[in-house]
UniProtKB/Swiss-Prot annotation:
A motif (Gly-cisPro motif, important for rejection of L-amino acids) lies at residues 137-138. SUPFAM superfamilies: DTD-like. An aminoacyl-tRNA editing enzyme that deacylates mischarged D-aminoacyl-tRNAs. Also deacylates mischarged glycyl-tRNA(Ala), protecting cells against glycine mischarging by AlaRS. Acts via tRNA-based rather than protein-based catalysis; rejects L-amino acids rather than detecting D-amino acids in the active site. By recycling D-aminoacyl-tRNA to D-amino acids and free tRNA molecules, this enzyme counteracts the toxicity associated with the formation of D-aminoacyl-tRNA entities in vivo and helps enforce protein L-homochirality. GO terms for molecular function: D-tyrosyl-tRNA(Tyr) deacylase activity; Gly-tRNA(Ala) deacylase activity; Ser(Gly)-tRNA(Ala) hydrolase activity; tRNA binding. NCBIfam families: D-aminoacyl-tRNA deacylase. Disulfide bonds: none annotated. The keyword tRNA-binding applies. PANTHER family: D-AMINOACYL-TRNA DEACYLASE 1, D-TYROSYL-TRNA TYR DEACYLASE. This is D-aminoacyl-tRNA deacylase. It comes from the Bacteria. It catalyses: glycyl-tRNA(Ala) + H2O = tRNA(Ala) + glycine + H(+); a D-aminoacyl-tRNA + H2O = a tRNA + a D-alpha-amino acid + H(+). Belongs to the DTD family.
Amino acid sequence: MIALIQRVTRASVTVEDEVTGEIGPGLLVLLGVQKEDDEQKANRLCERVLGYRIFSDADGKMNLNVQQAGGSVLVVSQFTLAADTERGMRPSFSGGAAPDRAQALYEYFVERCRQQAINTQTGRFAADMQVELVNDGPVTFWLQV
């Protein structure tokens, strides 16, 4: 399971001209689910994402996680993160989880975030989405379990 996380001042996702999720300061999480992923990996990745200290403390050091910083989370499914790009000029998506399994793990990940009392917004699984964000820093990290 892969999360591309970005520290943002604001972010939103729109599907068919409808805003389905919107946050102020916090994390935009682009989530990719791979074939071998399961609930245990989703738990570990959620723990890492929410615990990752990429927000500045009073001294300006990256020392706070999203909850300590009072931020929110916007989770957007992105199967392209599971692509194999090592050969050729076209990505292969054979490493991605089957759609039903990927959706179940995506929804499980979102629910785990919500259980941590963090405002968690979402896109719509498998939809054509427009994501708008203001990356703060810029600060972007690739987390994989």
